[in-house]
């Protein structure tokens, strides 16, 4: 067993999660990850592989530097979260996402960058790749960031740049942008969204059914 003894109260020491090539699907070795992220402000001295990797990236909910990369649909996959005060949270996390649109009202997003199933609304980000990979059935809406990437804590504002498209699928994800993709009853919300409107997405992360705030990194 290898381990480090580290004074986490030292202001110069931090815990960070980094993604290989800063996207979900790249396969990069642990030594190469810090090597590609080292700079005068970030010198890495220890690292560990944080999760198993599948076709959609890490299996579990993943956040890095305050950005939500992916969420796990259920509660059966354990993870460790790090908050802004360097406190660790462990357990089986579950994340909810609230969508608020001036034209479509309020709705729930099932997950981020996950495989879309029946009667689900999924939010895809450009961290997944260039397209959603969805089949034809359903409705998809393209958007760009108003105030940065999808936050793991707090509200993210987005603006619709591609009006609702029905029964085509595999929509291109705008650079540094998003696609809302839904099937079944969730399409009732998406078809009401309009080109140029600004909407909000707000996550809430639960560890073992307890809402946890200020999570910046998790896997």
Task: List the model feature ranges, each with a label.
Residues 1-178:
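Zymogen propeptides
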Residues 5, 202-204:
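Residue-level recognition of well-ordered beta-strand positions that form the cores
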Residues 34-35, 188-189, 210:
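Generic recognition of flexible, low-complexity loop/linker segments
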Residues 173, 190-193:
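Hydrophobic beta-strand core residues of beta-sandwich domains
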Residues 178-191:
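Short alpha-helix capping/helix-loop boundary micro-motifs
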Residues 193-200:
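Loop/turn positions that initiate beta-strands
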Residues 204-217:
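Short, Lys/Arg- and Gly-enriched loop/turn segments at beta-strand edges
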């Amino acid at each position: 067993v290898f381990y480090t003894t580290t004074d986490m109260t030292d202001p110069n020491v931090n815990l960070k999660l980094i993604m290989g090539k800063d996207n979900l699907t790249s396969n990069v070795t642990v030594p190469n990850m810090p090597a590609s992220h080292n700079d005068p402000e970030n010198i890495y001295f220890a690292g560990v592989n944080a999760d198993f990797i599948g076709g959609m990236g890490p299996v579990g909910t993943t956040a890095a530097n305050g950005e939500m990369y992916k969420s796990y649909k259920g509660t059966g996959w354990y993870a460790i979260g790090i908050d802004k005060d360097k406190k660790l949270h462990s357990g089986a996390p579950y994340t909810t996402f609230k969508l608020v649109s001036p034209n479509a009202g309020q709705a729930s997003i099932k997950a981020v960058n996950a495989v879309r199933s029946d009667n689900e609304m999924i939010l895809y980000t450009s961290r997944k790749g260039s397209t959603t990979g969805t089949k034809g059935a359903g409705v998809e809406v393209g958007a760009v960031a108003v105030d940065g990437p999808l936050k793991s804590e707090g509200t993210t504002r987005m603006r619709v740049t591609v009006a609702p498209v029905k029964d085509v699928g595999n929509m291109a994800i705008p650079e540094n942008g998003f696609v809302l993709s839904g099937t079944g009853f969730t399409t009732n919300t998406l078809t009401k969204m309009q080109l140029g409107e600004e909407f909000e997405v707000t996550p809430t992360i639960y560890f073992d059914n307890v809402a946890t705030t200020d999570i910046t990194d998790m896997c």
